Amino acid sequence: MPQNVVLPGPAPWGFRLSGGIDFNQPLVITRITPGSKAAAANLCPGDVILAIDGFGTESMTHADAQDRIKAASYQLCLKIDRAETRLWSPQVSEDGKAHPFKINLEAEPQEFKPIGTAHNRRAQPFVAAANIDDKRQVVSASYNSPIGLYSTSNIQDALHGQLRGLIPGSLQNEPTASVPPQSDVYRMLHDNRDDPAAPRQSGSFRVLQDLVNDGPDDRPAGTRSVRAPVTKVHGGAGSAQRMPLCDKCGSGIVGAVVKARDKYRHPECFVCADCNLNLKQKGYFFVEGELYCETHARARTRPPEGYDTVTLYPKA
C-alpha cells in the first residue's frame, strides 16, 4: 500500500538503498540505522521507493536516486510501497469447527497372569503330558531337549538330591539297596574287576635311581653328583642373541638403530653425554669413549697453550 513519509533535514538520513533501472530492480531500502531519522519515521528494510521529492523512480538509475536524496537539504519526501503483513491462522474445516484429537485418559484393565503360564507358548507334539495351564508351573515343559528332561517331576527329583547332599545325616536315613552275593550279576562284576596295579615309576626317576644304586655300598648315596639333562637351545634363541644392544641404556634395539664407530644406539639415546642434545643430523664426537656434541667436545679436549683446536670433518 503506497504511503508518504517525510524526513526532516538535514542529512544524514540513516538508510541505505539498492536497485535501480541499471540493475533491473526497483529501489528498495535494505538497511536502517538504529536511532536515525529513517528509524524515527518508521521506515523498514524492504520498503520500495516509488518517488523521491515528487519524482518517480521508474526510470532512475541508482546514481540518480542518490543524487536526488543528496539534493534534499531541508526535508526529504519519499513515497514508499510496503508489503502487507499477513498473520498465520490455523486451518479450519468447512463447517467452521476444528476436529481435535480424541485422547482417552481412562486406564484400561488388563488380565493378570503369573509369569510362565502363557509366555512363549508353542505347540510341542513330542512333549510328555503336562498341565500347561497350571498356574503353579514356572518352568516350561521342554526347551528343545529330550522328552521330559526339564519336566516338573525331574526338576523336583534333582532338587531333592541336591538338598540331601547339603543336609548332614541324610545319607544314614536313606535305604541302601542290598544285592545278594550269590546272584549271577554280583559274581560277574566282582570276577571281572582287576586287582589294583602297582604305581608306575617315571623314566627319568628310574634313571636317577639306577645311577644312585650302581655306586659302592660304603659310599653314601647322597654324595653322588647327578647332572641334570642339558636342554638344547633352539635356533630362535641364537637370532635373539644377535639383537643389537644399545651402548647407552643397554637394552635391545628393535626397529630403527643408529650406528657410530661400531656402537649401536636407539635414536632417542643418540644424545650428548653432557647436555642430552639429540645428535641426529648433527655432528658428533667421541671423547674417551663417550659421545658429545661439538660444543662439549671442544670443552673436554682443550689443547696446550699456544695451540688452537681445528675441527676436521670426514670427507663424504
From Swiss-Prot:
GO cellular-component term (any): actin cytoskeleton
Pfam families: DUF4749, LIM, PDZ
GO molecular-function terms, A-Z: cytoskeletal protein binding; metal ion binding; structural constituent of muscle
Cell compartments where the protein resides: Cytoplasm, Myofibril, Sarcomere, Z line
Main subcellular localisation: cytoplasm
Modified residues (Phosphoserine): S18, S93
Top-level taxonomic group: Eukaryota
The name this protein goes by in its record: PDZ and LIM domain protein 3
Gene name tied to this protein: Pdlim3
